[in-house]
């Protein structure tokens, strides 16, 4: 229960941090922040030939703050990720396909996940690792292109004990 309340508090702080940035954005993209642990970073394998089957309306925010067509691994531009060799497929692929089909709008994904972290490490100013601050910074970059529609968190097993 404590972990859930903590997560709600962290996400509330994230949402509040974006209010001022929304007034100055474009409306070209629906922005989605995908953060969390290894499950969000992507550790799954895809069937050969289906690795990069994205809708033409799905994009990523790259490490230079620019919009590029989405390709896997989605966590490739994360400012906090572990090595590229372990970045694979996460829930962002299926999510982006569904949301793009449902809305018909351009989707901009900000994927900034890191495996092996705990909820406490994502708290604002708590860990010194800067995961919260990086999520806020990258989302503000993306909001020059569109409006933040949702923050999607996927827990790994960092707090399972």
Which residue ranges define each predicted feature?
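Bacterial N-terminal signal peptides that target proteins for export
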Residues: 1-7
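Compositionally biased, low-complexity segments enriched in small residues
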Residues: 4, 16, 116-119
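Bacterial N-terminal signal peptides
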Residues: 8-17
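Sec/Tat signal peptide C-region and signal peptidase I cleavage site
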Residues: 19-22
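Cell-envelope and extracellular/periplasmic
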Residues: 24-161
């Amino acid at each position: 229960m404590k972990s859930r309340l903590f997560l709600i508090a962290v996400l509330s702080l994230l949402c509040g941090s974006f209010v001022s940035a929304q007034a100055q954005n474009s409306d070209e993209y629906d922005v989605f922040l995908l953060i969390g642990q290894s499950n969000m970073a992507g550790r799954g394998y895809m069937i050969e030939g289906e690795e990069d089957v994205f809708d033409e309306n799905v994009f990523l925010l790259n490490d230079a703050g620019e919009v590029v067509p989405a390709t896997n691994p989605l966590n490739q531009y994360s400012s906090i990720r572990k090595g590229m060799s372990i970045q694979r497929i996460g829930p962002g692929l299926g999510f982006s396909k569904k949301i793009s089909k449902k809305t018909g709008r351009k989707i901009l994904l900000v994927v900034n996940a890191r495996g092996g972290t705990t909820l406490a490490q994502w708290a604002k100013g708590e860990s010194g690792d800067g995961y919260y601050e990086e999520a806020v910074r990258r989302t503000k970059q993306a909001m020059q292109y569109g409006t933040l529609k949702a923050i999607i968190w996927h827990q790994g097993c960092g707090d399972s004990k």
